Amino acid sequence: MFNPFQQVELIKAEPFMSMPAKFRNAKRTSWADPNRQGAEIECFLEGPSFDREGNLWFVDIPYGRIFRISTKGEWELITQYDGWPNGLKFHKDGRAFICDYKMGLLSLDTKTGKIETILGSMYSESFKGLNDLHFAANGDLYFTDQGQTGIADPTGRVFRL
């Protein structure tokens, strides 16, 4: 039988690094109760994104934390707030944007750690729960509002700004 596709190379995934003990905080949270059946959780990391200097940024959903790992592998807690950040991306102008399940579309001042709401609702309607985002080459921002939707409830949305 003809197969036009080449054999896929299997690559063994290995941990890049682990969260330092000083940032681990195993306890129940209002995020973990519905999403992890009430289990204690140390962290739930999402939204990896590199800035222009090569630092790796990501979010910790249950604790509302934004972290940066420097090019030297040093962890830094940039900010912590009362939200559930899920996705993080950098615009080509250097600004950081966050999709937050509870708070909507946010911006982050990477120097001060200040969080600002860009869009908390749309068309006078609350979001279901923002999840992730992507910047197109022309600068348009696409973001998903999925909440707890899925096959049984296919009402999630994609927005463009």
What are these regions (language model features)?
Residues M1-L161:
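Sequence-structural signature of mature extracellular/luminal beta-sheet repeat domains
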